[in-house]
Amino acid sequence: MSRRTRAQKRPTAPDPVYNNVLVNMLIQRVMRNGKKSLASRIVYEAMKTVQERTGEDALQIFERAVKNATPLVEVKARRVGGATYQVPMEVRPDRGISLALRWLVQFSRKRAGRSMSAKLANELMDAANETGSTIRKREETHKMAEANKAFAHYRY
């Protein structure tokens, strides 16, 4: 077991446009090679596209997409007597949001299309409507946990 103390969670600053912590977290996930201005431009363009296409507030749709994509349970590998079991565990709220944002960006990148902002906008709208690859990933995670319910007593 590690003797080091657990690192303190630093508070995340809200983004300048929407004054929202979640939007800033999304910008951080979209960012590559430290290019934050490019990442923020991509996210804000995606939000503008969502607003134009749906006619609703982009921030509400984004928050609904994150809420829909957040997993409640996941499986973790645990070795017991030479065998590795997939043990279902509840997901902490901060980890759930982190996974949801990670999946949104990951599946946006895999989408066919020209610009990242358009792909991100489409993925956000799909997730808000409970469709798309991100939601499929969450359902897959829940199914894995359900299938391995028998090993729940190995929880740690």
Swiss-Prot record:
Parts forming coiled coils: none
UniProt-listed HAMAP family: Ribosomal_uS7_B
Positions of transmembrane segments: none
Keyword Ribosomal protein: yes
Pfam families the UniProt entry points to: Ribosomal_S7
One example GO MF annotation: tRNA binding
GO cellular component entries: small ribosomal subunit
Keyword terms of this UniProt record: Ribonucleoprotein, Ribosomal protein, RNA-binding, rRNA-binding, tRNA-binding
Name of protein: Small ribosomal subunit protein uS7
Subunit structure: Part of the 30S ribosomal subunit. Contacts proteins S9 and S11.
GO BP: translation
Keyword RNA-binding carried by entry: yes
InterPro entries: Ribosomal_uS7, Ribosomal_uS7_bac/org-type, Ribosomal_uS7_CS, Ribosomal_uS7_dom, Ribosomal_uS7_dom_sf
Protein family (similarity comment): Belongs to the universal ribosomal protein uS7 family.
Domain of life of the native organism: Bacteria
Name of the gene encoding the protein in the UniProt record: rpsG
Gene3D superfamilies, sorted: Ribosomal protein S7 domain
